[in-house]
Amino acid sequence: MSSSALQVAKTATYLPDLVEVQRASFKWFLEKGLIEELQNFSPISDYTGKLELHFIGEEYRLKRPRHDVEEAKRRDATFASQMYVTCRLINKETGEIKEQEVFIGELPLMTERGTFIINGAERVIVNQIVRSPGVYFKDELDKNGRRTYNASVIPNRGAWLKFETDKNNLLYVRVDKTRKINAHVLMRAMGLSDNDVVDKLRHPEFYQSSIESANDEGINSEDQALLELYKKLRPGEPPSVSGGQQLLHSRFFDPKRYDLGRVGRYKINKKLRLTVPDNVRTLTHEDVLSTIDYLINLELDIGGASLDDIDHLGNRRVRSVGELLQNQVRVGLNRLERIIKERMTVGETDSLTPAQLVNPKPLVAAIKEFFGSSQLSQFMDQTNPLAELTHKRRISALGPGGLTRERAGFAVRDIHPSHYGRLCPIETPEGPNAGLINSLATHARVNEYGFIETPFWEVKNGKVDKEGNPVYLSADLEDECRVAPGDVATDKDGNIIANLIPVRYRQDFEKVPPHQVDYVQLSPVQVISVATSLIPFLEHDDANRALMGSNMQRQAVPLLRPERPLVGTGLESQVARDSGMVPITKVNGTVSYVDANEIVVKDEDGNEHFHYLQKYQRSNQDTCLNQRPIVKIGDRVISGQVLADGSACEGGEIALGQNVLIAYMPWEGYNYEDAILVSERMVTDDLYTSVHIEKYEIEARQTKLGPEEITREIPNISEESLNNLDEMGIIRIGAFVESGDILVGKVTPKGESDQPPEEKLLRAIFGEKARDVRDNSLRVPKTEKGRVLDVRIYTREQGDELPPGANMVVRVYVAQRRKIQVGDKMAGRHGNKGIISRILPREDMPYLPDGTPVDIVLNPLGVPSRMNVGQVFELLMGWAAANLNCRVKVVPFDEMYGAEKSHQTVQAFLEEASKQPGKAWVYNPDDPGKLLLKDGRTGEPFDQPVAVGYSHFLKLVHLVDDKIHARSTGPYSLVTQQPLGGKAQQGGQRLGEMEVWALEAYGAAYTLQELLTVKSDDMQGRNEALNAIVKGKPIPRPGTPESFKVLMRELQSLGLDIGVYTDEGKEVDLMQDINPRRNTPSRPTYESLGTSEYEED
């Protein structure tokens, strides 16, 4: 197929760098965030005030990381740099100053791709969306149905302050959800006189009742107010004026305890129209008075005062890596501060040095904890390049300081008008996290305050000005403008054609003439996320199916020979580039050398630039990362050009699946309920074959009886089984292995007690000591096979860090080729997913008029009820493109080029294709898009014409090989003695409540009895049954299930006198069957206790 790509519609602009969110945030942390924290942290003085320790934050430096990225991955190390900062210790008494550079901990560094390497695993820090600090006004209905208003001042850290009104028009204040306090008591405690307050209010008459109420309570002075405040906030402690002052100061006016943050100060100034300087981060009197004034205006329903919508994106901000890390550094430094103060007090003042005072451990621990176990630090989804890119652009409302799944209501999860162009309305998980985890829209960026902005073209007198740079607006600013959508039709000069344009204004829709339009959206794609923007004809799909399509593209397995989609959207190349999976040249020049492992580019000055390619690396999801050169020696390359394809890339574009010939028709019931019928060609031609790399690991540990040994000499193993092992007992690279084969031979010393009786007998007779070790080798698990790709040996002598108690670690990487098979899951890009039900020989598949058999047969009933008609457009456009020998790019939302444009374009392409020589049969004007197929088995034509075409189909990561599982015998749960569940534990199938009903309904009493006893948790019964089967005797009657005994014990532990009795009323001892020699009952009965204790004198 030729690589010429026809662009049906032109996208307005290129997308911005898609991983900028991560990189820019980390850069800010290194340049500003870290310095800010170190500066806020110093000086630290001891309790006497004699010594002072200053951190000179701007002079911190990072050392070169010990390992580079690849080395860190290989050694299971962290890609991190050591932080040093200059400290100054000042002795106030002697004036002596000691300056020293001190090590304060290790900081993991971000790789170029926006990820972190922690303990050898690639991780991503997900962006968090939280409520912005600031002041919020809300209304509530009290129990009498009267509307009351309240105002909350929410800081970045510190106590919340909430003002509220009651039915008597009194103003109250709560600090951190404590008891209500009269608002005027707080004013007086802050040192404000009645006049100070009244002068600042526009409607003081409303506030008068609060002043009178405070006077009635006898709180007339600042001291009394402070005492009252202390009583309310610290009930039970003896109040004092100084205590009240101290409390008030520490709660609201101490920068270490209370911080509005830059954002909080900006939001409060904006809402209350104040001019407090940016660097004042604590509460001011002005803030409090203006809040009260605004609240009174709301109560009196005076214009200009408005309520806040907490789900509006103007009131929610994004915390990216840099800020999350900054918060964590603050936690670490606070822990460090306590240690420094203690050491200052304990140590000898004269001989102390900064290095002795500063212990890096608390800071290291805090950073480690964040990267290792925070909810926002996630193991990177590396299934394919798109999954990686989407993961870095994910925005989560969960995590520390955010919401929890259980508490989040519908309002938070819902799509809000302010999401337009900022968060994708389509891409979100299905299930409990729906709406809490979102994806950043394609053109969106995060501004310095953490609010999401999106770009627009300015419109001047009805003409779209595309000459200058686009204007980025946050949600707050956009509300004040009239914004037209991106698919507005314009003439070639940029003048808007229509007389009335639909615009969004203050979260509503209205129609206005062109000269009233302020801005036009940059591109139709800017509303949706990256994954969604790869769906062609998206506008013809129902949102639920588009959501599934977006999510399933992230689960596509990279194939052996990827193929770009015939019908794309034009964003494929940018996704591949920004994912970091394809190497890109940074200079103009000529390719001077190419092989499978490296590409060398010589620039115009004759300098050589080396690009090393990844070969068959294992990804986090066990898929294969591999890069293939696409340039030849002598090629001219320009800066930014792609040099090699990564996994799931072809020609520098993302290629998640294959273009296959699809027919929509039922076939013998094999595509009932979304099942998929596929041709054998998919297997034989390796269309959907993927490479998976499994990692197996074994440790040789130090045991009580001596060290474990990795060796070739394994007891009771045939020489044949050791064929592929080297002299150390480790498998050779390139060997083919099946399940059960030994990968690494290991023997463990065993103690006297471990020996079976026959060995003891041999010893007693011959006095010879059989080698007392047992086989503990690493073997290939059940259902797995493949070829050994790599072996890595880690020992302490080589300088590797090993887990405690281990002397040696061996890792074996086994690659396997997985062809497509029955039970694998496949999907298109429109949420049309299914499981393969049968693989049919290609001669039996329905075939086209020219004799070509189709590759896949899908059920036509999968389209109408699901309303994802985009798949039909893609099918026919793909059919036309394949026959025209070209590829097509279709931008979503194409009605700006005319009504019903998708329809017309597809039809025009089909007509064009049928004009090619010998292709007249491709398009039938009487039945457009359908062809008469013949049955491969009989050669007879089918009754009706069938929709046929080329579609891009993906193989998803839910492979049957990873899920299929069977158990004959295996491990049991200790308490209930029932088989464990799940493949990993070699578990059994659960026979649940409903399955029991089914057997009861059929009256299959004996089957049911043995399922609930012998086959499950009747311990004695199952042993007896096994013996009976081995000896060929009839199976004895089942006994009591263990779980019933557990239930009895639990009821007895609650103090219930409960037992099991026969018809005659004799108690049955349930524990009898475990130890037949035990005569005492399982719980004390009057008979067993004897009556001697209870006999009367």
UniProtKB/Swiss-Prot annotation:
Record region (Disordered): 1072-1097
GO cellular component, one term: DNA-directed RNA polymerase complex
Polar residues: bias regions: 1077-1091
One example GO MF annotation: DNA-directed RNA polymerase activity
Domain of life: Bacteria
Catalytic reactions of this protein: RNA(n) + a ribonucleoside 5'-triphosphate = RNA(n+1) + diphosphate
Stored InterPro entries: DNA-dir_RNA_pol_bsu_ext_1_sf, DNA-dir_RNA_pol_bsu_external_1, DNA-dir_RNA_pol_su2, DNA-dir_RNAP_su2_dom, DNA-dir_RNAP_su2_hyb_sf, RNA_pol_bsu_bac, RNA_pol_bsu_CS, RNA_pol_bsu_protrusion
CDD domains, per database record: RNA_pol_B_RPB2
GO process terms (BP): DNA-templated transcription
Enzyme Commission code(s) on record: 2.7.7.6
Keyword Nucleotidyltransferase: yes
SUPFAM superfamilies per UniProt: beta and beta-prime subunits of DNA dependent RNA-polymerase (SSF64484)
Keywords: DNA-directed RNA polymerase, Nucleotidyltransferase, Transcription, Transferase
HAMAP family listed in its UniProt record: RNApol_bact_RpoB (MF_01321)
Free-text function comment from the UniProt entry: DNA-dependent RNA polymerase catalyzes the transcription of DNA into RNA using the four ribonucleoside triphosphates as substrates.
Subunit structure: In cyanobacteria the RNAP catalytic core is composed of 2 alpha, 1 beta, 1 beta', 1 gamma and 1 omega subunit. When a sigma factor is associated with the core the holoenzyme is formed, which can initiate transcription.
Family: Belongs to the RNA polymerase beta chain family.
Protein name in the entry: DNA-directed RNA polymerase subunit beta
Source species: Prochlorococcus marinus (strain MIT 9301)
Gene of this entry: rpoB
